[in-house]
Design a protein with these regions (language model features):
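Substrate-recognition/cap helix-loop segment adjacent to the acidic, metal-dependent catalytic center
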Residues: 1-22
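Conserved Lys-Pro-Asp/Glu-containing loop-to-beta segment of HAD-superfamily phosphomonoesterases
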Residues: 31-52, 58
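Terminal substrate-recognition subdomain of acyl/acetyltransferases
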Residues: 37, 59-126, 230-286
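Short, high-confidence coil segments that cap the C-terminus of an alpha-helix
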Residues: 40-42, 173-174, 234-237
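Acyl-donor binding region in acyl/amide transferases
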Residues: 184, 190-266
Length: 286
């Protein structure tokens, strides 16, 4: 870290770096460590190195990581990488602006969990606070972004535009939920969304349920479903229906509906929950 500390004129500051790793370990192993701390997919990572041998090691060990073949002249690096459009985004939300800070906070959580005696104690110690509200106009870019980018915790992998999200918000046939989370280390922001579609016979169908991988294993899904069932009871809804559509990347939620008390309707891929029979989950989100 010495160059950052001693050279105040540097454009890149230490605070700009989410996870700082500087050692003599294999770089592929270091990338694995960073990936675990940040809780992102390898296919979202780019590795830049001026040493061809190091680039080859990472390519062979982590084929999902993008490894550009940099030109020999360092003066050409900037234009070369810029032309690859690796960091382009269709839209830019407030959540993107806060990304580095959020990753730094996540690193602190990872450090803490390594010291915890069990998961329950760890989750209690986070002092998590959740908020679930209908979609609002200010959140539309972030909500649309979640539908476009999220692959792992995504029940049906439906991709929606900002116009689609606005339609759902204004529709009498839909209930919409955006879920925010914060804990003692910081604010996760908007990390999950649920869209329910009203169908015949007093039922709602889970059109979309998406959650950021940053909050996996926190119990957010239990918090969300408890709150939604309360609302469905108030409007005299009898059934909540769901569906899991498999993709190459969403195996993480293959058994989610089973865990959430929805029963599979054989031989179809449809699930059903009787609101009357629902038993609220215990969790550590207040």
């Amino acid at each position: 870290k010495e160059p950052f500390i001693k050279h105040s004129e540097m454009v890149l500051k230490l605070d700009d770096i989410s996870v700082f790793v500087a050692n003599w370990n294999n770089k592929a192993d270091n990338i694995r460590y960073i990936q675990e701390v940040l809780n992102i997919g390898f296919d979202s990572m780019v590795f830049l190195d001026d040493n061809p041998a190091e680039r080859d090691i990472v390519r062979k060990n982590l084929p999902e990581v993008t490894v550009p073949e940099l030109p020999e002249d360092p003066a050409l690096y900037l234009s070369y990488v810029s032309n690859l459009n690796l960091f382009e985004t269709a839209n830019y939300s407030k959540n993107d602006k806060d990304r580095t800070l959020q990753y730094q906070q996540e690193a602190k959580r990872k450090k803490m969990i390594s010291k915890a005696t069990n998961m329950d104690d760890y989750l209690k110690s986070l002092k998590m606070v959740g908020q679930i509200t209908p979609f609002n106009k200010e959140e539309t870019p972030r909500i649309a972004q979640l539908t476009q980018r999220s692959n792992q915790f995504n029940l049906r992998t439906k991709r929606y535009t900002e116009e689609d999200i606005t339609h759902f918000s204004n529709s009498n046939k839909h209930l919409t939920y955006s879920i925010k989370l914060k804990d003692k280390y910081g604010d996760y922001g908007l990390i999950s969304l649920i869209i329910l579609e009203k169908i015949a016979n007093g039922s709602y169908f889970i059109d979309s349920w998406i959650m950021s991988c940053r909050v996996l294993n926190r119990g957010v899904e239990y918090f969300a479903l408890n709150e939604i069932i309360k609302e469905l009871k108030k409007i005299n809804i009898d059934l909540l229906l769901g569906e899991y559509i498999e993709t190459p990347k969403n195996n993480l939620v293959a058994d989610l509906l089973d865990k959430l008390q929805l029963k599979k309707e054989a031989p179809y891929n449809q699930y059903k929950l009787s609101i009357e029979d629902y038993k609220p989950f215990n969790h550590y989100v207040s």
